Amino acid sequence: MGLLVTLIGDMVGSRDLPDRAGVQRRLAAVLDEVTGLLDPAQRLETTVGDEFQGAFDDVGTATLAALMVRLALLPEVDVRCGLGEGEVVVHDPTSTPLLQDGPGWWAARAALEELARPRRSAARTWFEGPDPGAAARVNAFLLARDALVDRLGERGLRLLAASLRGSTQADIAAAEGISRSAVSQQFSRGVGAVRDAQALLSPPRGDGEDDT
């Protein structure tokens, strides 16, 4: 399939979840939803165990997908996503999940394995690519972005998820049943920073970016 950004993710601490079957069904539904929103080169789908994968045409959309999946599952379940840029070879396009490998796929696998190292225990997204300098810049963004997400409460997580889907602050206030002022306060505490930083890497969706 040529040069892609492959995403390979897994659930954090999945063996300790009380309802693993229910969580797997929820993950599958979230992956279908994000696939519909972002139109990836390869749809997001579960693979084996607690893992899932997909592929995108650019790193910005891949980082957005990782964040959208994470936000849809938090706070009950957390995920880690390894992203790898490079050529992907699909050996059997009829299989589900796709039977594939190649430098891009292995780079994503290496990125996920990096997240399993003790020094990355707090990180949730990592990128490996052919240009070390570019990869370092992407990872600097991802480390800061995911740390900000970790500081958000449940409402902040919902507001950020809605904003990334294109909802304006007025839309969000109506959906949450709270005032515009309360929404604005949440945006000033990190929601807006994450949304705006993400928009620099991936195209904004809807009108949410215009309503500050």
Q: Which residue ranges define each predicted feature?
A:
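Regulatory and interdomain segments flanking nucleotide-handling catalytic cores
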Residues: 1-212
